[in-house]
């Protein structure tokens, strides 16, 4: 597909996926500062919630510094042109959370499921459409499903009322060819008016290349984060993606230099650690492991003396998926016991 002159919607993840490396402890001032910068740079859609979506505050996923209501209530009134989205994972977020988000002024709701479990999204997608919200079906860990399986799941979400379907590389595992294969298949199967999106992670440093491949395959919504702030090695770094789009003639409406300044001056200073491809985040991509598992594995490493890399490789071997964070500690305990037993023998 020729991309010269193609218009796409860039969707910011800094204030949602970026909550993972911040351990969900972003302050209201940090959130407002970054959101206003993104708005001024021309980013049209910004996601704001706990890293695991509406209702994510829990022992399993982590307690945030503020509630979803407080974050959304602080950011939405400040926006001059950008719309705000929220993520919702059925089983974590509820229809009540959906109504709360709508009442606060959230424009877009993204209902996320594992790539083979779209059927659990029906209630939430149907409710969002009844509220006349921009409603997105978000298929996570898409590398684990064949194009044919993704088509089946995407069409379920479309049938429930989703006006946009996302193919999501939650593990940062896919290469550009994998992205094209899946998105071209899904694009061909959906109704022409149904939009197509791609969400990438940078664990194999493929975030930008994969996002370009997605646009070439027919996607018109692309997720990215300023300075890549997100789980694992981060999301597709927005400032790089915007520059590449500008070079290629893809129209984003985002100012090339203003988004660089947001990344450099507003996002990098709040990082608890530099978001980069290190051995553990690289392992996420190599082994096909859910990106938000990274900090859980690092904590287990300190607690049980088993390397985070070994834990992540084992999680990949077991094909664990998002929502099974509790299994990280269980896996680390098992591995530590096995090694202690071998040492004793």
Swiss-Prot record:
The keyword Manganese applies. It catalyses: (S)-4-hydroxy-2-oxopentanoate = acetaldehyde + pyruvate. It is an enzyme of class 4 (lyase). The keyword Metal-binding applies. Residues 8-260 form the Pyruvate carboxyltransferase domain. It comes from Leptothrix cholodnii (strain ATCC 51168 / LMG 8142 / SP-6) (Leptothrix discophora (strain SP-6)). It comes from the Bacteria. Mn(2+) binds at residues 17, 199, 201. The record marks 16 as: Transition state stabilizer. GO terms for molecular function: 2-isopropylmalate synthase activity; 4-hydroxy-2-oxovalerate aldolase activity; manganese ion binding. This is 4-hydroxy-2-oxovalerate aldolase. InterPro entries: 2-IPM_HCS-like, 4OH_2_O-val_aldolase, Aldolase_TIM, DmpG_comm, DRE_TIM_HOA, PYR_CT.
């Amino acid at each position: 597909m020729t991309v010269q002159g193609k218009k796409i919607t860039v969707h910011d993840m800094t204030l949602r996926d970026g909550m993972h490396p911040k351990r969900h402890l972003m302050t209201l001032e940090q959130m407002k500062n970054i959101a206003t910068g993104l708005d001024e740079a021309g980013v049209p859609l910004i996601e704001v919630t706990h890293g695991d979506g509406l209702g994510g505050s829990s022992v399993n996923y982590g307690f945030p510094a503020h509630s979803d209501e407080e974050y959304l209530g602080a950011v939405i009134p400040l926006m001059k042109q950008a719309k705000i989205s929220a993520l919702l994972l059925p089983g974590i977020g509820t229809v009540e959370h959906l109504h709360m988000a709508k009442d606060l002024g959230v424009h877009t709701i993204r209902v996320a499921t594992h790539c083979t479990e779209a059927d659990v999204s029906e209630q939430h997608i149907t409710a969002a459409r009844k509220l006349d919200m921009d409603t997105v079906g978000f298929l996570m860990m898409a590398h684990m499903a064949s194009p044919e399986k993704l088509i089946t799941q995407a069409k379920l979400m479309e049938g429930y009322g989703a006006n946009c379907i996302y193919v999501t590389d939650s593990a940062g595992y896919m290469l550009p060819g994998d992205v094209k294969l899946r998105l071209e298949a899904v694009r061909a199967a959906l109704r022409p008016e149904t939009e197509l999106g791609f969400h990438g992670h940078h664990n194999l440093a493929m975030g930008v290349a994969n996002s370009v491949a997605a646009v070439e395959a027919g996607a018109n919504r692309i997720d990215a984060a300023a300075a890549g702030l997100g789980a694992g090695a981060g999301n597709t770094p927005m400032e790089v993606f915007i520059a590449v789009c500008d070079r290629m003639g893809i129209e984003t409406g985002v100012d090339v230099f203003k988004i660089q300044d947001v990344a450099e001056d507003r996002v990098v200073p709040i990082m608890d650690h530099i978001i980069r491809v290190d051995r553990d985040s690289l392992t996420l991509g190599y082994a096909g492991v859910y990106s938000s598992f990274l900090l859980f594995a690092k904590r287990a490493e300190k607690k049980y003396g088993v390397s985070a890399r070994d834990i992540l490789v084992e999680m990949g071997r077991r094909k664990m998926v998002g929502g099974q964070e509790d299994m990280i500690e269980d896996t680390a305990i098992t591995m530590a016991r096995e090694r202690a037993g071998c040492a004793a023998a």
